[in-house]
Amino acid sequence: MFTKVLVANRGEIALRVIRACKELGLETVAVYSEADRECLHVRFADDDVCIGRPPSRESYLNIPRIIAAAEITGADAIHPGYGFLAENAEFAEIVGASNITFIGPTPQQIRQMGDKASARKIAQKLKVPTVPGSPGPVESLEDALKTAEKIGFPVIIKAAAGGGGKGMRVATDPEMFAQAFNLARQEALAAFGSDQVYLEKYLARPRHIEIQIMGDTHGKVMHLCERDCSVQRRHQKLIEEAPSPAVDQTLREDIGEAAVKLAEEIGYVGAGTIEFLLDEDGSFYFMEMNTRIQVEHPVTEMCTNFDLVKEQIRVAAGEPLSFVMNGHRLRGHAIECRVNAEDPARNFQPSPGLITAYHPPGGPGVRVDTHIYAGYTVPPYYDSLLAKVIVHGNHRQEALARMRQALDSFIIEGVTTTIPFLGRVLHHPDFLAGTVDTKFLEREPHLLKEPT
């Protein structure tokens, strides 16, 4: 086991990793930008190092400074959290070359699954269903249009190196295809440094279902069932739950088996998430793999009683998986709401500033993962996530009642938050019935504004 872990992140996930390390008896190192000097992860770590100015590229994305911080403090492992450098194969490579353990998969695994076209080829080789699309990146507009006509409109054009909804454009007919294709390539180049794109059939009302997996260095891979992340805005998840209201035990076993097969094929080590689209007819299609811990991992923890972050650290240290589970031990129902410093009525415009009052919800089955406090200033430089409210109940109705109560009693003043908006979603008949899909908010834009 390690002795000291550097957490190459900030905010709630940095605190989450520090907590897991402390439970395992490990010392921790926080790195922070000048804007995050007053952050709680800095206060709770055993050591802390300022790694630069507020912009991410000068701090949380600055690989040499993070490695230097690890060497100065004697850290023998680095946990990347999510976002920033978590899925950067070059970072994982440099960490290893510096004789420090990267808590996550190998650089090769990050590359294999981080490139969507490569991941799709692996899925097809294993006969895991994929959405009909181009076999790899399309090189020219002419080739792309031929492929689109073969697949059948509507199609979605996606960045090969992408994620987070960037570099994605939908074309409903040949007339609008050229414009969508060129825009997707421009966005892909700006966001990811590569203008390669591929095409897929566009599904009208799919659900977003993902499988949590964990692999060890002894060749064992387990899955911990599904999460439903269908409530999204521009491919950004807002509410997640487990289990999915749309997945029965037979489908759960089929999707879980497909996810494990993919992870086993590359000898995957650590926590990962394999994302699928579930069509209205019950067909599921592999979409992509995230080679890191996810923001929404707590809903799985609440339903399985496993600490996924502690397990990540253990398997990175070479220990075998501490549990045996493949889809059979879900306990009750969990829901997570992401509370952001954003104004839904103004196109989710960020709302940085001073938090003047803060009171989190509590009670049985309620968990709040957060880094904020009264007097904390939300900086304008980073993701606007303030807190994750996670509830667990014996069944979905109990979990829903707990979440509504939790949001009603959650006080954050000084900045605009998404709490009222989340409350409106939780009262919507489609959400109550468990029938939402990824286009739900596009059809219900009135939910973004306070009723007059």
What are these regions (language model features)?
Residues 1, 164-165:
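An N-terminal boundary/leader segment
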Residues 1-126, 138-146:
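ATP-binding N-terminal substructure of ATP-dependent carboxylate-amine bond-forming enzymes
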Residues 7-26, 48-50, 71-73, 89, ...:
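ATP-dependent carboxylate activation and anion-phosphoryl transfer catalytic cores
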Residues 133-134:
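Conserved beta3 strand of the protein kinase N-lobe
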